[in-house]
Amino acid sequence: MSLEIVILAAGQGTRMRSALPKVLHPIAGKPMLGHVIDCARQLQPERIHVVIGHGADLVRERMAADDLNFVLQAEQLGTGHAVAQALPFLSAEQVLILYGDVPLIQLDTLQRLLAQVTPDQLSLLTVDMLDPTGYGRIVRDDQGAVQAIVEHKDATPAQRQIGEINTGILAVPGKRLADWLGRLSNDNAQGEYYLTDVIAMAVGDGLVVASAQPLDAMEVQGVNDRMQQAQLERHYQRLRAEELMRQGVTLLDPQRLDVRGEVSVGRDVLIDVNVVLEGRVVIEDDVRIGPNCVIRDSVLRRGAVIKANSHLEGAELGEGSDAGPFARLRPGSVLGARAHVGNFVELKNARLGEGSKAGHLSYLGDAELGANCNIGAGTITCNYDGANKFRTELGDDVFIGSNNSLVAPLKIGDGATTAAGSTITHEVPAKNLAFGRARQKNLENWKRPEKIRK
């Protein structure tokens, strides 16, 4: 059956106390609406319609994509009214309705929900709660068939004792939806057009109302304030941590890991506390990551070691290489096999060949180093003249003395050496020793200045 999806994302989110539309607040570094859209895409619908209202322009700008149709709800008159705004664009046999502030919904749950939809049967997602206060109750008859959904403010005392609640997520036969929405009334305590009223209409029309429940109740937890946002964040991170551990990762404290993207891991990986993984991160077998590291869009090859307090972005570490502590590898940084970058070393668009080392206190930008090079402490590649960037190229087995300034564009040949304290401005041929510093002078009988007495 053909499928279209409507995502309701028009709410203001006043309890968030924020200028940012609620659905753009993040879970794991991604807007809540982004999580819902990603899940919806896995169902391969013909189209996804996003109903927007408060902050509509910003939501459209942030989430724009070719497969999304944004529909404006100028006035927020209830969920039924919101879905009605998408009606002119709907033609599929099935329509699935989701919510932009329910970010943890899972594909398996939605597939089970949709499997129950036929031309004469709709399906809604429910969950049992110990404290259902504030939620719409699922009213069933003596045989257990769903009869209606009653919102909390409209419920009788007896109905408020019901623990099964409406999540708002439902799937309906597309040909029936327009008729039901056209019959909605706002004669209720909220003065709104409730989408949930279509359940009673469906029953009255002789349709069967099926139901499904998520395996994890947190899947359908919505976000109305920052506390709920934090709860979902921690729940999401716990799930990701458990997933990594099942794949062979040792987490020294699963509660102190943040995953904010797509992570691929090998076996026998060890991750210390307070590590943040962002974007697309590939971690191969036997990698070790120390505490307080941030790793974004990077590849860590087999046996690589990241020591404490290091920051990697757009970097690749070869087999058996290591970085840190306090190393910063910016986009385009590549360490060859067994290469080493030590404390307070920054790389940017720089490649270190196999076995090369930059032990400490150096900046290497727009540089290409061959194999088995040694970079002395305090070395800087001077790659920018105020207008353009230039490259520094070192051959194999180059030894750079401490406190060197390598002024690009510059080439240093295989086996060359530069003396400590040098400013190197011209090409150094292979196996040459280059000095680029003032000759030392010693002044005899030097007397230190004395303080002036007043």
Swiss-Prot record:
Active site: 360
Cofactor(s) the protein requires to work: Mg(2+)
Cross-referenced Gene3D superfamilies: Hexapeptide repeat proteins, Spore Coat Polysaccharide Biosynthesis Protein SpsA, Chain A
A GO biological process held by the record: lipid A biosynthetic process
Primary gene name: glmU
EC number(s) stated in the UniProt entry for this protein: 2.7.7.23, 2.3.1.157
Annotated positions binding Mg(2+): 101, 224
Assembly with partners or alone: Homotrimer.
Co-factor binding details: Binds 1 Mg(2+) ion per subunit.
One GO CC term on file: cytoplasm
SUPFAM superfamilies: Nucleotide-diphospho-sugar transferases, Trimeric LpxA-like enzymes
Top-level class of the enzyme under EC nomenclature: transferase
Organism: Pseudomonas paraeruginosa (strain DSM 24068 / PA7) (Pseudomonas aeruginosa (strain PA7))
Name assigned to this protein: Bifunctional protein GlmU
Lineage: Bacteria, Pseudomonadati, Pseudomonadota, Gammaproteobacteria, Pseudomonadales
Residue numbers spanned by region N-acetyltransferase: 248-454
Presence of keyword Nucleotidyltransferase: yes
Catalytic activity: alpha-D-glucosamine 1-phosphate + acetyl-CoA = N-acetyl-alpha-D-glucosamine 1-phosphate + CoA + H(+); N-acetyl-alpha-D-glucosamine 1-phosphate + UTP + H(+) = UDP-N-acetyl-alpha-D-glucosamine + diphosphate
